[in-house]
């Protein structure tokens, strides 16, 4: 773009253009179809879980008091501002957006806990179970979980999520989302915008795992983090040739420590051209999760001409 065209592209002194909504086939979701039916957290999968995506009730309020009336239905996990949600309304900084739905708990198993998982809620979320505050989270981009166990009752349980999003009017909001979109700034999005699900776990469960491939030593390190103090629980780690459940087992390690290194021997390296992934199962007591990893290493080095390059698996790798 030359200087004249650059000046013409400026918004200064221009009248506001006519606004219209962009829509695609992806914004159309049949009412009977469950959005995103797959397990939402591919690197830490549990077998028994319940998808809570779908139609929730919602209400906009000007106060923090939980409303008795509902404004309608919203399709989770689509933000209220987008067409797919069925709402098409902006959440303003001084408003609150409430989500409501019920879950059925026929029986509360002994020695189990029920975790409610959120992929992301923008921006400040507070969760209530049967009218009692169960937890919350500040930040619109990270996942979080809430333990519902203490607030449950047998039968029907009501969940309520209160959301506030101050967007670009507060120090917490940075980026291109704006209440006055134009140019490179786009309409702010708010509320639940990633999948919601629940899963039963034992009293002591895997809260987080970290898998680190060690390319040079043909091994992989696995760290586990439990939800509470570790009392010497045995952890079992199994690495398979692929993510298929019946794939050949390469190595198994049992330990009471929270970190273990497993030797793979000859391995298939990961690259964009050959994206081979190994499957891994991690067990800690009664809890079990499935995950995966690729054997690769990144770095910066000099090529044969002495030019600094990005290296993948010990070789210069071009990317643009």
Each predicted region: which residue ranges?
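Short strand-turn-strand beta-turns centered on an Asx-Gly dipeptide
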Residues: 128-134, 240-242, 285, 313-314
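Short, aromatic- and glycine-rich surface loops/edge beta-strands on solvent-exposed regions
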Residues: 158-161, 274-285
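Beta-strand-rich binding/interaction modules
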Residues: 129, 219-253, 260
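Signal that preferentially marks extracellular ectodomain short beta-strand elements
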Residues: 146-150, 261-275
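Conserved, mostly hydrophobic/aromatic
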Residues: 56, 131, 196, 278, ...
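Accessory beta-strand-rich segments of carbohydrate-active enzymes
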Residues: 8-12, 22, 26-30, 38, ...
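Surface beta-strand/loop "capping" patches
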Residues: 200-230, 306-309
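N-terminal carbohydrate-binding accessory modules
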Residues: 209-210, 279-320
């Amino acid at each position: 773009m030359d200087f004249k065209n650059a000046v013409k592209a400026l918004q200064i002194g221009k009248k506001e253009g006519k606004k219209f909504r962009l829509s695609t086939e992806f914004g159309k979701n049949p009412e009977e179809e469950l959005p995103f039916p797959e397990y939402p957290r591919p690197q830490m999968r549990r077998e028994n879980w319940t998808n809570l995506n779908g139609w929730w009730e919602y209400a906009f309020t000007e106060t923090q008091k939980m409303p008795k009336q509902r404004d309608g239905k919203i399709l989770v996990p689509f933000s209220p501002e987008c067409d797919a949600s069925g709402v098409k309304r902006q959440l303003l900084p001084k408003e609150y957006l409430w989500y409501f739905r019920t879950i059925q708990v026929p029986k509360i198993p002994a020695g189990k806990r029920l975790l409610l998982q959120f992929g992301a809620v923008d921006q400040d979320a507070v969760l209530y179970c049967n009218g009692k505050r169960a937890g919350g989270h500040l930040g619109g981009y990270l996942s979080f979980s809430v333990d519902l166990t203490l607030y449950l009752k047998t039968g029907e349980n009501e969940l309520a999520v209160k959301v506030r999003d101050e967007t670009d009017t507060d120090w917490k909001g940075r980026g291109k989302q704006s209440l006055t979109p134009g140019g490179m700034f786009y309409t702010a999005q708010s509320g639940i915008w990633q999948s919601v699900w629940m899963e039963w776990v034992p009293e002591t469960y895997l809260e987080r795992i970290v898998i680190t491939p060690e390319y040079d030593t043909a091994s992989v390190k696995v760290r586990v983090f439990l939800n509470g103090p570790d009392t010497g629980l045995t952890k079992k780690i199994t690495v398979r040739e692929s993510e298929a459940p019946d794939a050949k087992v390469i190595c198994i390690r049992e330990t009471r420590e929270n970190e273990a290194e497993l030797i793979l021997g000859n391995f298939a390296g990961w690259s964009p051209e050959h994206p081979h992934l190994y499957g891994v199962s991690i067990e800690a007591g009664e809890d079990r999760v499935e995950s995966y990893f690729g054997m690769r290493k990144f770095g910066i080095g000099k090529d044969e001409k002495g030019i600094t390059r990005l290296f993948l698996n010990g070789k210069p790798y071009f990317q643009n």
